């Protein structure tokens, strides 16, 4: 737990634009404490074989203090300078955390203090809910909020919905940030951005979160025509309304026949077919069948075609290279499940593009210790 506190403190400081004003307090279990101003760097060194377990704090003048981890009782960081989100439920002001289903929507009042880094968000009514799959069952809950109109938040493109990622099993709080930075560096279309923020829920500080776009078809994320294109997800959670399994051996689609030994779990992630299909003069099931057949044809080509030239008729090769480069360099274990494997297509006449990349909780030599 002590290591987690220290890593969290280090990330809070590194994520701040006002590091020269940091006040970092280390309270020792012998009732003494150390106070550091102008903290520039925190390093953590541990050797299980030798029992070495130390933290080093370096200030702006280059002075370094070494602290025994076992002597630390608690750590407090003041004035991190990162944006602060304040969310107060109007239907359950006494709750200390969201309960029930992640899809339960609650009316709330949200405001954001940009702390001089970004424009503030004035108080406004939002819809607040949970998100995530396995992460929803963890102690530090991930959230999602939706505003009445598209709004720019922390420099991100205007959108109605945004996600607050808890990063509970990432004791560095940096895995998703590093991977998404790499995706943007490679200029992958529609790659998510992220901003470290502090979240208060009904007045209770929930710690540091990662603000990012809600992945989906829309101007703030996968910006394609929702009446022509489609966003797919291959994910073993297999929990969307429109889904099918692709048999890797017979090269056929099997409705609701997902089996992790021989099939791929394919789902329509966005848009909502029940809303889009009627505008096209189709039922949702008819429109789903059209895209299911198209996606299956692409998978069959990938599984059976030896020629890269022929595959260009089905997939965008550059997007494939960048997708696997990000996941390989980050050593993302989610690919093995598979989970969060997203692909999109502008229209039925186009080609499939891999991305946007998502979910790097189990990456970069992961250590699943909570934050």
Predicted regions mapped to residue ranges:
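Sec-dependent N-terminal signal peptides
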Residues: 4-13
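Sec/Tat signal peptide C-region and signal peptidase I cleavage site
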Residues: 15-19
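Cleaved targeting-peptide boundary
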Residues: 20-25
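Short, solvent-exposed loop/turn motifs
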Residues: 31-33, 64, 116, 205
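Structured surface patches comprising rigid loops and adjacent beta-strands/short helices at the edges
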Residues: 36-47, 68-77
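Phosphate/dinucleotide-binding and metal-coordinating scaffold of catalytic cores
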Residues: 77-368
């Amino acid at each position: 737990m002590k290591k987690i506190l220290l890593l969290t403190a280090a990330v809070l400081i590194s994520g701040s634009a006002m590091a020269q004003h940091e006040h970092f307090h280390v309270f020792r279990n012998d009732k003494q404490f150390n106070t550091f101003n102008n903290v520039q760097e925190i390093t953590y060194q541990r050797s299980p074989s030798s029992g070495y377990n130390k933290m080093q704090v370096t200030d702006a003048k280059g002075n370094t203090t070494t602290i025994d981890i076992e002597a630390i009782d608690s750590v407090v960081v003041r004035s991190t300078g990162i944006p602060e989100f304040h969310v107060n439920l109007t239907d359950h002001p006494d709750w200390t955390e969201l309960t029930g289903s992640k899809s339960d929507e609650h009316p709330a009042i949200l405001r954001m203090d940009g702390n001089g880094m970004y424009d503030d968000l004035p108080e406004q009514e939002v819809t607040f809910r949970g998100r995530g799959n396995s992460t929803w069952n963890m102690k530090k809950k991930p959230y999602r909020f939706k505003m009445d109109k598209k709004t720019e938040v922390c420099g991100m493109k205007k959108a109605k919905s945004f996600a607050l990622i808890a990063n509970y099993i990432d004791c560095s709080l940096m895995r998703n940030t590093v991977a998404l930075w790499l995706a943007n560096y490679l200029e992958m279309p529609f790659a998510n951005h992220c901003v470290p923020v502090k979240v208060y829920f009904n007045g209770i500080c929930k710690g540091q979160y990662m603000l990012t776009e809600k992945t989906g078809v829309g101007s703030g994320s996968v910006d394609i025509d929702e009446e022509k294109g489609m966003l797919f997800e291959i994910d073993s959670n297999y929990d969307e309304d429109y889904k099918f399994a692709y048999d890797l051996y017979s090269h056929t689609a099997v409705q609701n026949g997902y089996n992790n030994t021989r099939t791929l779990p394919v789902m329509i992630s966005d848009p909502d077919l029940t809303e889009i299909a009627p505008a096209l003069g189709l039922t949702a099931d008819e429109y789903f069948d059209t895209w299911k057949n198209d996606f299956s044809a692409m998978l069959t080509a990938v599984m059976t075609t030896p020629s890269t030239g022929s595959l260009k008729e089905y997939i965008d090769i550059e997007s494939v290279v960048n997708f696997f480069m990000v996941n390989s360099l980050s050593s993302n274990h989610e690919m093995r499940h598979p989970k969060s494997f997203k692909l999109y297509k502008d229209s039925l006449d186009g080609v499939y593009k891999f991305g946007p990349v998502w979910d790097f909780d189990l990456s970069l030599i992961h250590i699943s210790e909570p934050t």
